[in-house]
Regions:
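Generic structural signal for hydrophobic core residues of well-folded globular domains
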Residues: 15-16, 49, 69-72
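Short acidic DE-rich linear segments
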Residues: 111-117
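Short, amphipathic alpha-helical interaction segments positioned at domain boundaries
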Residues: 63-88
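Short, hydrophobic-biased segments on the C-terminal half of alpha helices
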Residues: 39-43
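Leucine-rich, amphipathic alpha-helical/linker segments
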Residues: 81-110
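Short, basic interhelical loop/turn and adjoining N-cap
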Residues: 33-34
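Short amphipathic alpha-helical interface segments
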Residues: 1-30
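A short, conserved structural fragment
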Residues: 46-56
């Protein structure tokens, strides 16, 4: 299954918005395609350090996950980030974060007059 960066962002947003401390993505024998995608992407989020598995199919967002989400939360920043990643032919989640932070720094300079270098 190919990694879907929009879906990664969606799972992080869902996890943060939930009143529950955990995101469920339980693996079972008769999983639908959507359930497989959810489980696989939750595992990818664990690989990246953005989620921690607290039980089989039960995940919590980590501080690293919150930081990534803070960088990609804005739809404007996210769309610019995806466009830039596409121009590069695809990038790692770390580069996605760096691109998003770069756009946030540009906005800070324009809107606040602060150069965050």
């Amino acid at each position: 299954m190919k990694r879907d960066d929009d879906y990664i962002r969606q799972l992080l947003l869902e996890s943060e918005a939930s009143s529950e401390p955990y995101l469920m993505a339980v693996q079972h024998l008769s999983m639908t395609t959507e359930e497989q995608k959810r489980h696989q992407h939750a595992e990818l989020l664990c690989d990246a350090g953005f989620f921690e598995a607290v039980n089989k199919g039960v995940y919590r967002i980590t501080n690293q996950g919150h930081d990534y989400l803070a960088a990609v939360r804005s739809d404007t920043v996210w769309n610019k980030t995806k466009e830039s990643a596409g121009q590069l032919g695809g990038v790692t989640l770390g580069i996605m974060r760096d691109l998003a932070v770069g756009y946030i720094k540009q906005e800070a300079k324009i809107k606040l007059g602060i150069d965050l270098g």
